[in-house]
Amino acid sequence: MKVVAITGKRECELVDRPDPRIKGNYVRVKILVAPMCTEFHQYRDGNPGDCLGHEAAGEVVETAGPARVNVGDRVVVMPQNGCGKCRLCLAGEHIHCQTPIDPLAICGTPTGRATYAQYCIQQDWLLVPIPEDLSYDHAAMACCGLGPTFNAMELMGVDRFDTVLISGLGPVGLGGAVNALFRGARVIGIEANAYRAALARSIGVAAVIDPNDPDARAQIMDLTGGLGADKSVETSSAQAAPALLAEATRPKGHLASVGWGGPIAASRIVGRGLTIHGAWHWNHFLHTDRMMHTIRGTKSMLDRTITHQFPMSRV
């Protein structure tokens, strides 16, 4: 099969690798859509390798035996590999599994872990069925495009009465805006990139603040009647972002971190009575119907946030 390999700084090519083998509860999936996530850092920095991509949507083409899915099923491929046996996995929180398994150890195949490829393998319980009325493009957003911030909205209980502040309006932050807007919330963004800011405004974000502006916090306070945002989500991983959100979230408000940025002083958390949430991915045991309902209701916004589409042959 063909897979994408990074060969140098801003250089990549298609290379031939063996088709992945499956065993046990593993399933082989033909990749039809693979969103771009953090892999661009590796491309930009020139870190060589051919294990790229951790999310996808595609079609089941082979099972090793009786499985929860069938050949021909359309599925979203969940990221990571939980053990499937621990308390977290059994509760649908496989992303936090402390004893993840290595597909290589189970299937004996060096390929199949990456999604920038023609095929990948995944355990059957980590494949989410795609409803007939959703396209592969839209369904693929159930991973990092919408998933982490969907979890943040669930944890914080975002609704139409909230003003939600989102720091970082890249692919994950824009997904946060889509999630919050679908729930009827008013959204304020923090973003320095003009293209991303304009894209956010085009889907309904009320205002976008430049984090490099020394008056950024004051502008947020002005937009929230001097109180601060009801709920905040950090997606940028910028070192200063969590502290800014802690200052710009109202007392007794909620702050969810999707990004892996800098610290928040305990005095800010306690003094403002903030509830802090860590949000990495969504619970597909509990919330699959809600996730698909969100995708179904935000197709027009997703069509804007899916800015570019390329065949793998153009890599």
Write out the residue ranges for each language-model feature.
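Glycine-rich cofactor phosphate-binding loops and adjacent beta1-alpha1 units
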Residues: 156-160, 198-275
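Mid-domain Rossmann-like dinucleotide-binding core that forms the NAD(H)/NADP(H) cofactor-binding site
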Residues: 125, 132-213
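C-terminal substrate-binding/catalytic core of Rossmann-like NAD(P)-dependent dehydrogenases/reductases
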Residues: 263-309
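Glycine-rich beta-strand-centered segment in the early N-terminal region that forms part
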Residues: 19-34, 44-90, 131-133
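NAD(P)H dinucleotide-binding glycine-rich loop of Rossmann-like/cofactor-binding domains
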Residues: 42, 83-167
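Short glycine-/small-residue-rich Rossmann-like dinucleotide-binding loops
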Residues: 35, 64, 237, 259-260, ...
